[in-house]
Design a protein with these regions (language model features):
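Short Gly/Thr/Asp-enriched flexible loops that form oxyanion-binding sites at enzyme active sites
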Residues: 13-17, 21, 144-153
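Adenine-nucleotide phosphate-binding core of ATP-dependent small-molecule kinases
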Residues: 75-133, 140
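Conserved phosphate-binding/catalytic loops in two-lobed NTP-binding clefts
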Residues: 151-171
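Short beta-strand scaffold segments in enzyme catalytic cores
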Residues: 3, 9-15
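Short glycine-aspartate micro-motif
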Residues: 1-5, 26
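Glycine-rich beta-strand-to-loop/alpha-helix junction loops that act as flexible
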Residues: 6-9, 131-144, 167-168
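Glycine-rich phosphate-binding loop plus the immediately following alpha-helix
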Residues: 18-71
Length: 171
């Protein structure tokens, strides 16, 4: 299986047995990126507070999704697929409606952006290493149902057959 340790960034390990494992990849995007971007954009650098806001947000207000391009009669199965994180903010600013942008929506958009980035890497490494199960763990996921839900959905977005598990421990 693949073990994805998400903290400030992401470290991806391929686990062949309890005694045999190797680091196969990672990325610099993780909780540190979420906190830094959140501080810069909405002035909040507390992880728990960011997640509280994200729980109340609707990213479709500021992300461009497939729904924005669908005609009335088109298939809506994937209408919420994100095409561009924060993609609608530019129009809010052009229309003079910058103060209508909600911190909650930005928090959720940023969380989705980080989670989709993380899962794209982990699913690609799982495929490259012929593995069908990913275990996510670390401070980013610990006892966090919203993060775990997004990671699960995003992993399935990249590969519907991937098995996703969560461990509530950190190393």
């Amino acid at each position: 299986h693949i073990s994805a340790n998400i903290g400030s960034g992401l470290s991806i390990l391929k686990i062949s047995s309890p005694e045999k494992y190797e680091r196969v990849g990672g990325t610099l995007m993780g909780g540190g990126s979420l906190i830094g971007l959140s501080k810069l954009i909405i002035g909040i650098d507390n992880y728990e507070k960011i997640l509280e806001l994200a729980e109340k947000g609707n990213n479709e207000n500021i992300d461009i999704t497939k729904k924005d391009f669908l005609k009335e009669n088109e298939d809506l199965k994937t209408e919420n697929d994100i095409i561009s994180s924060l993609g609608k903010i530019h129009q809010y600013i052009l229309d003079g409606k910058k103060n209508e942008i909600k911190k909650e929506d930005i928090a959720l958009s940023l969380l989705n952006m980080i989670c989709y980035h993380i899962t794209q890497y982990t699913v690609l490494y799982a495929k490259k290493n012929d593995v069908d199960t990913i275990y996510y763990f670390g401070t980013f996921t610990k006892n966090n149902s919203l993060v775990n839900k997004i990671l699960n959905n995003a992993s399935k977005h990249w590969n519907k057959d991937i098995k996703v598990r969560f461990n509530n421990y950190r190393i």
